[in-house]
Amino acid sequence: KCAIHSQAGSILHIPREGGYLCRVYVDLGVVPEDDNHKVRNTPIEKIIEKANEIYAPYFVDVKMVAWHSVYEVGHRLVDAFDDNDDDPRVFLTGDACHTHSAKAGQGMNVSMQDGFNIGWKLGHVLDGRAPKELLSTYHGERQPAAQNLINFDREWSTLMATPTEELDDPEAVEKYYVAAEEFAAGMMTQYEDNLIVGTTQHQDLATGFPVGKRFKSFEVLRRCDAYPQHLGHQHTADGRYRIYAFADAPKAGETSKLSEWAEKVGPILAKFTPEGADENTYFDVKAIYQQTDHHEYEILDAPLLFRPRNGKFNIPNWENVFNALPGDKDIFHTRGISRDGAVVIVRPDQYVGAVLPLDDPAAVEDYFSSALIKLT
């Protein structure tokens, strides 16, 4: 996107598909209190005229307007995203919950996150894998996220509407946008402790994966074919939890915390898995070894937990074992992962649910005992 700020006002450009379309937000200025919404009837010719005042001494010769509208910025937030704290039956998402300006480009992004959040939770409850209490986490997670968006948008839209001569710093708009880049990218939301968000007690084991925030991906090397992959890109929207087991120093085939953890966690996960279903039906468990040379061990040396058998023909999945890359691409270094190992549980919506020690497999059962229903 491109933000233009001049003495005549501000404009926000967002390029569109096809190579010739462009969405343009034109600030029409302060609306008088007695306007009675007449500004909403502003003709397109007046909008183009105002745009060129802002562009001056440059101008744009508009060839075609595919669609336009005029709206007044209103910052509003509902009191609740559901109808009942104990047993909710009605859920609100998106614009039904929060309204704000379009200048941050966050409306659709945040609304889709609302929908994804309640969507996977409904799916888990309706198919019997999670307790109905899971639904109560929707309001607790998304209402504060919407409030943070409105706070951000109020500050951003006010800054964009402030005449340049009134700004303390002529580069204030640019500096604020750069500083808020991570928020605009959707990576700043952080959920508080609840049924599916653990405490930060062991956060020091993986400082680059903050509990309650989006899983921030990084490249690793897939062992089966020595192909570099972004770890987070293996997380498809299939309703499963991801469990990333970052190994301690020994390589696969040697006695280690990871091998002992895998031996004990396999039976734990089986307690939540339907009888007769593939062992990775509800969980996708991946190992990431510290060794940067994939020739140092054979994939068959990795514990069976990371080589689950799937489908009608009981075929092993070879794509769950990874190595760190060398040098400054080492995920252990870049994401602050302890060389003693760590376990990172990621929810179906790609938010980090827990960071746990590798030498405490029982902590995995504790986490999922709240998130899921034990079947055996």
Residue ranges, per PLM feature:
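FAD/FMN-dependent oxidoreductases across multiple families
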Residues: 40-106, 110, 145, 149-153, ...
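Functional cores that coordinate and move charged inorganic groups
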Residues: 97, 108-123
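Short, cationic motifs built from Arg/Lys/His that form the positively charged side of catalytic pockets
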Residues: 21-23, 86-89, 94, 98, ...
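Generic beta-strand/beta-sheet core signal
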Residues: 25-27, 68, 93, 246, ...
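Structural scaffold positions in well-ordered secondary structure
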Residues: 65, 95, 115-118, 138
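Helical substrate-recognition/capping region of FAD-dependent monooxygenase/halogenase enzymes
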Residues: 15-17, 31-33, 49-54, 86, ...
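Conserved FAD-binding catalytic core of PHBH/FMO-like flavoproteins
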Residues: 1-73
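Short, histidine-centered active-site or binding-site loop motifs used for metal coordination
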Residues: 26-30, 96-97, 103, 247, ...
